[in-house]
């Protein structure tokens, strides 16, 4: 996959996601995607090194749709998952959790840690949206990671979805 991204980037850009056709990069796109992934990792590192109390990585391209071997939904690399895996491998953490609250399912983050018992993913998203067929409550992880994926698909009605989101977070 990395070689594909590299070649498309070197050859002037183009489409990476053949399955959904939603991820294009331009010439030099690999460098930009690597900067975004590095930004996510640097944010995690800053928190682990206690340089900051918390961090928000405002990066493009985003990452929650990119799967281990496939770009998707404008995402080249699964940046949050890369940051989380950095925390596990270099930060001395035993467990991590990802909260993905977005209209689309966080399929890429979920796919990266699908079998990892150290990583919990919670995705709150609109049901039957993007990617098609993804994010059902039956998706719970696999092997040692069974039970570590929690999907909360909300109805497509914006008012119902918003109200339900507030109830999930107990925000009044």
PLM regions with names:
Residues 1-172:
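HDAC/HDAC-like amidohydrolase catalytic core signature
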């Amino acid at each position: 996959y990395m070689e594909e991204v590299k070649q498309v980037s070197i050859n002037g850009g183009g489409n990476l996601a053949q399955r959904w056709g939603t991820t294009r990069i331009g010439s030099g796109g690999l460098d930009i995607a690597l900067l975004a992934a590095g930004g996510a990792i640097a944010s995690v590192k800053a928190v682990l090194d206690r340089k900051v109390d918390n961090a928000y990585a405002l990066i493009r391209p985003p990452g929650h749709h990119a799967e281990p071997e496939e770009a998707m939904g404008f995402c080249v690399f699964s940046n949050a998952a890369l940051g989380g895996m950095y925390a596990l491998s270099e930060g001395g953490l035993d467990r991590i959790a990802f909260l993905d609250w977005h209209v689309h399912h966080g399929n890429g983050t979920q796919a990266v840690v699908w079998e990892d018992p150290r990583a919990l993913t919670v995705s709150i998203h609109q049901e039957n949206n993007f990617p098609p067929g993804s994010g059902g409550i039956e998706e719970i992880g696999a092997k040692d990671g069974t039970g570590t994926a929690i999907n909360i698909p909300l109805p497509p009605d914006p008012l119902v979805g918003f109200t339900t989101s507030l109830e999930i977070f107990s925000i009044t």
